Amino acid sequence: MAVCYKARRFEVFKANVEFIETLNAQNHKFWLGVNQFADITNDEFRTTNTNKGLKSNSMRVLSTGFKYENLSFDALPTTMDWRAKGAVTPIKDQGQCADGKCKAGSNSAATITGFEDVPINNKGSLMKAVANQPVSIAVYRGDMTFQFYSGEVMTGSCGTDLDHGIAATGYGKTSDGTSYWLMKNSWGTTWGENGYLRMEKDIADKKGMCGLAMEPSYPTK
């Protein structure tokens, strides 16, 4: 039984490495790499390592409006990285979670008792919020490019069936002019850019890449 299991895992590993090498040979702005998910199928990946059910309704505060609404874009910094300001906790590994049992991945910096929502599908409002504090983000992370992401700015299309929580901890622009959101994940430092992900910021879809603009919120307490 153990031999069969190892043989099966090796076949999965080889198929995943082939996918990684094929994509990396194409003209993308980002690249993939072998990581802790290399010996599981994408179907297996989609049923684990998710923290669906990020916020309970009881944790939401009554909406009194978006508190950053009246900020001028001219007053916003052109780049932001909350890590440099000491406002981001170290990367953690949530382990293999399923069925909505992991809920702390995007808001682990402190004990949080309430949230306010950022206006949905509104990149400008999201930028105002992230310029002032880290923001909880829900995304779809079932795509294989998300599974094996290793560096640079992730571009392209992906789904919007939100199933995972990450935190927007900044934004910026690469030397070639590609704008991005800086995201903190909860899969350890062996995934992505030492546990972080950069996602393309200026795209046509108002929902944002992988639905990142659909359910943003920030802690109030």
Feature locations, PLM:
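Catalytic-core signature of thiol
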Residues: 1-221
